[in-house]
Design a protein with these regions (language model features):
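HotDog/MaoC-like acyl-thioester-processing domains
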Residues: 27-30, 34-39, 44-46, 50, ...
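Catalytic strand-loop segment that frames the active site of acyl-thioester-processing enzymes
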Residues: 30-71, 150-156, 161-164, 170-230
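Hydrophobic, proline/glycine-rich low-complexity stretches
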Residues: 25-112, 225, 281-282
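Acidic/His-leaning functional-site neighborhoods
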Residues: 197-280
Length: 282
């Protein structure tokens, strides 16, 4: 028999636990949230795909290191090559929700590199794609994880991952389930001391489906790295896409100042369209 007082005590405990958990979230920062992401090891069993390429002139900084926007393009390219090689029923209608890039060592201009990609986990409407960029001798240079959401072509709303794709990815996913919750949530952003500046859009920022391309967001992170030469490998960069940026809009960068790392929201009016963090990865 459960006494009334026992129920009251339990309810009070549950309320306090909920408040405690809420307080923990409130105390977190963009940095804490970004570094909490666990980059899974691999590749293990199951399908993996490898492509080799060279760091070319337009991919590198004047000092010769591979830029992060180039990394984002490489990730897109090898993902697309993999889906075509595996003959997915729907290789096109996927959008990136989040990209996490861990740089152990920056590839250099004219260096040959291998990109190996595999599935790190599956959800009902999305999948995590893990990619490792390595030197040709096998030395890991960059690890990345991108959360790709499958969308309906007509409505652009999330749609279930096709059965044939699940069958292809299941072995490498190893039973790992992933969710699409944001890491860099709005309430974690430090609003106390923010600098703002416009981010003018270019025609070249938009891709074949009319989206501001993932690589274009990483250009914003590169601007930070150009001004902070002390932030180099090992580093982590996180870019999350919340609301699509449309042609003709006027995005504004909101940057929390006074930090050694980048803490940024890209907003149009009061709406957060993207969130970014970049800093040293201890």
């Amino acid at each position: 028999m459960v006494l009334y007082t026992d129920v009251c005590i339990f309810e009070e405990y549950r309320k306090r636990l909920g408040q405690y958990q809420a307080d923990i979230v409130t105390l977190m920062s963009f940095r804490d949230a970004a570094l909490s992401f666990q980059m899974i090891e691999g590749p293990g069993s199951g399908r993996q795909f490898t492509a080799r390429r060279r760091v070319r002139l337009g991919d590198a900084t004047p000092n010769g290191r591979l830029r992060l926007d180039s990394v984002a393009r490489y990730l897109q390219d090898v993902s697309n090559d993999d889906t075509r090689d595996a003959d997915w029923s729907d290789p096109h209608w996927w959008v990136v929700r989040r990209t996490v890039i861990d740089v152990h060592q920056f590839p250099e201009y004219m260096q040959e590199i291998d990109l190996t990609t595999w599935c790190g986990g599956i959800g009902s409407h999305w999948a995590e794609r893990r990619t490792r960029i390595s030197a040709v001798d096998g030395t890991p240079l960059i690890d990345a994880a991108s959360l790709w959401v499958h969308v309906d072509e007509a409505t652009m709303q999330p749609s279930k991952v096709p059965t044939d794709v699940v069958d292809i990815l299941s072995a490498s996913a190893g039973g790992r389930d992933v969710n699409a919750r944001l890491l860099l949530r709005d309430k974690l952003f430090n609003e106390s001391n923010v600098n703002t500046s416009p981010w003018p859009l270019r025609f070249a920022d938009f891709d074949a489906v009319g989206h501001m391309n993932n690589a274009a967001y990483c250009v914003i992170v590169e601007e930070f790295l150009a001004a902070h030469r002390d932030v180099r490998a090992p580093l982590r960069a996180v870019v999350e896409h919340v609301v699509q940026v449309e042609p003709g809009q006027d995005p504004v960068r909101h940057i929390a100042s006074g930090n050694a790392d980048l803490e940024l929201q890209l907003r149009v009016g009061s709406t957060m369209h993207a969130a970014m963090w970049c800093g040293l990865n201890p």
